[in-house]
Design a protein with these regions (language model features):
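Generic structural motif
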Residues: 71, 107-108, 114-116, 123-171, ...
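C-terminal, active-site-flanking charged/polar segments
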Residues: 2, 188, 196
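Buried, small/hydrophobic-residue-enriched core segments of structured protein domains
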Residues: 1-125, 216-237
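Conserved small/polar residues in nucleotide/adenosyl-binding loops
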Residues: 241-244
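Flexible, active-site-proximal loop/turn residues at the rims of small-molecule/cofactor binding pockets
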Residues: 79, 176, 208
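Accessory, usually C-terminal, subdomains that scaffold auxiliary metal cofactors
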Residues: 191, 197-204, 208-223
């Protein structure tokens, strides 16, 4: 399976050490042994596919779709709403999380809420509604998320992997501190100079204190990714179900 990815010209991913979008910033990045390389356009993306790497384009509107004509399209923006994806975009269209309705604007939806149904493929209807409450990790939910204290430009003070305690300042905006409310390891944080608005998710503290988790895909990412793969294989006819 060949994969091409697109993102914003200035990605806002928090867990940058496990995000292929970093290829847009660095030119090349690697996640668990899989390499991703920045592509200038769709033609270069096709060339990079022959090198067995993941091409990443700064193409927030996915205009490359017209050239690449993918067999499957996955909207993993996680905006909690549909920003324009249509069921006619590709033979198989998959929406990730709330905001999509299988059968209306996509062929399948993959559940993103932590819990019993995480990663489940939905072929009719929608994912569970957004609660604005992060899932539990190490006994903590909303406390582990770091949010911008004001509108402005984010100033990064700590790196991913840094050990912190409650009260430590991980970043600041307009001189206002963004403090950690629990102890643990900084699992993700926005890069220096990112424009933010008050309350915007700007970092994440993992209370389990396992630095190695910063460089590997999470259980949630693996579950959702598995759901995406299942949906693509099923909807494309690669998975054929037979009666016992």
């Amino acid at each position: 399976m060949q994969v091409v990815m697109t993102d914003l010209p200035a990605p806002t991913a928090i867990r940058r050490t496990v995000c292929f979008s970093q290829a847009i910033v660095l030119g090349r990045t690697e996640v668990e042994g899989v390499a991703a390389v920045l592509a200038a356009d769709a033609a270069e993306a096709e060339s990079l596919l022959a090198q067995e790497v993941v091409p990443v384009l700064a193409d927030p509107d996915c205009r490359c779709r017209q050239v690449l004509r993918p067999d499957a399209e996955v909207d993993a923006i996680l905006a909690k709403r549909n920003l324009g994806t249509a069921i006619t975009d590709a033979p198989v269209v998959i929406g990730i999380g709330p905001g999509f309705t299988a059968g209306a604007d996509c062929h399948a939806v993959v559940e993103t809420m932590r819990g019993h149904t995480l990663g489940r493929v939905i072929y009719e209807g929608s994912a569970l509604p957004n609660t604005n409450i992060p899932g539990l990790i190490g006994g903590y939910a909303g406390e582990r998320v770091l949010r911008a204290p004001a509108d402005g430009i984010f100033h990064q003070l700590l790196d991913i992997g840094a050990e912190v305690k409650a009260g430590d300042v991980a970043g600041e905006v307009n001189g206002l501190p963004m403090r950690c409310t629990i102890g643990g390891v900084v699992r993700g944080i926005l890069p220096e100079g990112t424009p933010v608005h008050q309350g915007m998710k700007s970092g994440d503290v993992d209370p389990r204190c396992r630095p190695e988790y910063c460089t590997t895909a999470s259980d949630k990412a693996l579950a959702v990714g598995g759901g995406v793969l299942e949906a693509i294989l099923h909807l494309s006819g690669c998975l054929l179900y037979t009666s016992p």
